[in-house]
Amino acid sequence: MKYLILIILFSNAMWSQNLESHQWKDRILVVNADEKNRERAESQYLLLNKEQQKLIDRKIVLYKCIADTCMFYDWKNTPKMFKTDTTKQGFSIVLIGLDGGEKYKSNTVEKPDVFLNLIDTMPMRRQELRNRK
């Protein structure tokens, strides 16, 4: 069930498997937008891009999907583009935790601190911080 959201968001089997490969390694932000909401998706990306080091520190990767084109950002390597055969409706952003579960969902552009602060309250993040000391 926890992967159902991933499969729904990306029907392309190869990329669904790649999303599953993030479990226990990365937190995932998925920004979905139809063509009409392209500007909102780009605005969300620009806000996140300004916080790259904080995203890397929290193991956050981003899938930005507009219409049938997705970009994958891990903030360390060149972004990767791929096509999907699913049609997006409106605008949404979803945070998926290390365990593969949905942690946050919104239909509005959010400041990065919304995600960063939420992650900082999660037990696994707290453990990561304790282990650094």
Role assignments for model-derived ranges:
Residues 1-7:
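Sec-dependent signal peptide recognition
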Residues 2, 12-133:
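Non-catalytic interaction/Regulatory regions outside core domains
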